[in-house]
């Protein structure tokens, strides 16, 4: 069974709650990374960085990040070596994020899409699997570049 990490900033708490319920109804285990340990409102860099590291460290197989647009969360998650995050606002992009890019993290914007479309997008992403094939060398090249950056 997939273990899903979810995280949201203050702009997307309602959507996060809706998505969490949706995932739990599908029988998935969901861990929430939305809360700031200081008791302050969560800010997207902290949420995305913590969640991305939880994926990298093997605590969860997939991660869902939610903020106003999905942009900031996606940028931060992609700063963590080994993480491939994709901002998606349609089902086709979500499927391709998994099938072609092996994205372990998806980022969505609560101010861009509504809850029903968000559920469809996440469902499409969860149902898709990495195809390998011609995409495998491209994903490997991403890892190569990450390694180069780390050692410069």
From Swiss-Prot:
The protein's annotated pathway: Carbohydrate metabolism
Record key words, sorted: Carbohydrate metabolism, Isomerase
Catalytic activity: D-erythrulose 4-phosphate = D-erythrose 4-phosphate
Keyword field contains Isomerase: yes
GO biological process per UniProt: carbohydrate metabolic process
Protein origin, superkingdom: Bacteria
Pfam families reported for this sequence: LacAB_rpiB
Its biological purpose: Involved in catabolism of D-apiose. Catalyzes the isomerization of D-erythrulose 4-phosphate to D-erythrose 4-phosphate.
UniProt record similarity statement: Belongs to the LacAB/RpiB family.
Protein's name according to its UniProt entry: D-erythrulose-4-phosphate isomerase
Lineage of source species: Bacteria, Pseudomonadati, Pseudomonadota, Gammaproteobacteria, Enterobacterales
């Amino acid at each position: 069974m997939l273990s899903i990490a979810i995280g949201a900033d203050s702009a997307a708490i309602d959507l996060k709650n809706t998505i969490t319920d949706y995932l739990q109804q599908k029988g998935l285990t969901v861990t929430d990374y939305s809360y700031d340990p200081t008791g302050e409102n969560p800010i997207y860099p902290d949420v995305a960085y913590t969640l991305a590291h939880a994926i990298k460290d093997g605590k969860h197989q997939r991660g869902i990040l939610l903020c106003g647009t999905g942009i900031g969360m996606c940028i931060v998650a992609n700063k963590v070596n080994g993480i491939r995050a994709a901002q998606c606002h349609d089902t086709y992009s979500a499927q391709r994020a998994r099938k072609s890019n092996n994205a372990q993290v998806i980022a969505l914007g609560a101010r861009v899409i509504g809850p029903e479309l968000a559920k469809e997008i996440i469902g499409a992403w969860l149902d898709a699997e990495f195809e390998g094939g011609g995409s495998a060398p491209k994903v490997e090249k991403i890892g190569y570049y990450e390694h180069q950056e780390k050692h410069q």
